């Protein structure tokens, strides 16, 4: 069986999980989230731990078991603590502003770029060159961060662009005569 699937998901205090006809609902202090359980995976709850197991003994079932365990673990963390991603804008005149559900970026184009955040994702700008995205949904948060980064990905020669705060950009040397 998948090594990931062997580890049970532990439920912290204040988080409850209910299973209704292959639909798993997770409730916590940051809201509710749900997940559709794959037909090759079954789960059982023991005290404050959830154990996953495949319904049939096949490689595909084991793969789905590990995936479902990771997805449910992300839901539990999301409704309990939430997720955060930080983006940095590096370049002369590059700046960002967050207002409501929109992020306005000035990243070297002739016009400011406006990005509408998906529902459930919030943004704040502690400085003009930093964006902090927060959400309960890890997948939605990562997609929003990737969309914003896609407006001006970091380039390898000067390093200008929008990058994740923990991203390392490999620099290239300019062509020599």
UniProtKB/Swiss-Prot annotation:
InterPro entries: Ribosomal_uL6-like, Ribosomal_uL6-like_a/b-dom_sf, Ribosomal_uL6_a/b-dom, Ribosomal_uL6_bac-type, Ribosomal_uL6_CS
GO MF annotation, one: rRNA binding
GO biological process, one term: cytoplasmic translation
Biased composition (Basic and acidic residues): 149-162
GO cellular component: cytosolic large ribosomal subunit
UniProt keyword terms in alphabetical order: Ribonucleoprotein, Ribosomal protein, RNA-binding, rRNA-binding
UniProt xrefs under Pfam families: Ribosomal_L6 (PF00347)
Gene3D superfamilies: Ribosomal protein L6, alpha-beta domain
Cystine connections: none
Highest taxon in the source lineage: Bacteria
Disordered: region residues: 143-162
HAMAP family the record matches: Ribosomal_uL6_B (MF_01365_B)
NCBIfam families: L6_bact (TIGR03654)
Chain's role: This protein binds to the 23S rRNA, and is important in its secondary structure. It is located near the subunit interface in the base of the L7/L12 stalk, and near the tRNA binding site of the peptidyltransferase center.
PANTHER family linked: 60S/50S RIBOSOMAL PROTEIN L6/L9, LARGE RIBOSOMAL SUBUNIT PROTEIN UL6M
Family to which this protein belongs: Belongs to the universal ribosomal protein uL6 family.
Subunit and partners: Part of the 50S ribosomal subunit.
Protein name (database record): Large ribosomal subunit protein uL6
